Amino acid sequence: MVKVGINGFGCIGRLVTRAAFDSGKVQVVAINDPFIDLDYMVYMFKYDSTHGRFKGTVKAENGKLIINDQVITVFQERDPSSIKWGDAGAVYVVESTGVFTTTEKASLHLKGGAKRVVISAPSADAPMFVVGVNHEKYENSLKVVSNASCTTNCLAPLAKVINDNFGIVEGLMTTVHAFTATQKTVDGPSGKLWRDGRGAGQNIIPASTGAAKAVGKVIPELNGKITGMAFRVPTPNVSVVDLTCRLQKPAKYDDIKAAIKTASEGPMKGILGYTQDQVVSTDFNGDTHSSIFDADAGIALNENFVKLVSWYDNECGYSNRVVDLVCHMASKE
């Protein structure tokens, strides 16, 4: 089983750790966070306002974090090059601080003995992979990769199915996105993005997102054909993508539903979900799919112009894909 170190024990770091234990696919052997001491790690991992209490056991013992009787080495280094990943047995590092997102910065982990790094965020220059979409293009020569964003992980599987079956001429995406840690609880300063500084719990906030353009990086045929924006809304978790696109090949809405359902039961099983139920956002809290197509929420204006709706737990689904990407990379060693 591949041994993993987690850098940054924030929301995604903790949920990747949960996903590792829940799935049993990878073994977390080390965690680094200079801002969270060991006892606080125990508390933060045990209790989660969104996903509930961890169902296993968590404790601190002899300077180590023990989760389900598994011993995890804890570091508190600010400089990634100072973390002794090799000593702890970590071969792969999940870079989830949100700070070291370039190839150069993420590569600092390699100095401490790690073999490869997966950035749990979009990257300006690291190759981006979306499991179920382009993960097969991963090559063993790559040391640092990005798992893209939660929104790209929702949009890309849907866009791939539509493009493969009907062809996308052009598209606009809107994500109605739960608030995240980058936002303010009450109005405050926010650099050049003034709207982003408004109270997250009080407002629907129009915001930018690179998620749609990033789809062009993971599906080259769609490069320059899709762009999008976000509305940040006052909910703590679960977001939804609205993809409005013009199709090359005319298709009835039922044909589109059938193509997505087939993909969800076949090549994209576990990645792309499908529902015809009368669902709302909280119904997807804890869902491990990257994207769950809502068959009854979409509409077609005609056979070439459609609006498609797909849900995602922007924390849980994404964290599970980080684990899946690590597993896929390890299988190529």
Swiss-Prot record:
User: What's the short name of a Pfam family annotated to this entry?
Assistant: Gp_dh_C
- Keyword Glycosyltransferase (UniProt): no
Q: Which SMART domains match?
A: Gp_dh_N
Main subcellular location of this protein, as a coarse class = cytoplasm
- The residues the record assigns to binding NAD(+) are C11, I12, D33, R78, S120, N314
- What interactions and quaternary structure are annotated? Homotetramer.
Q: What is this protein called?
A: Glyceraldehyde-3-phosphate dehydrogenase
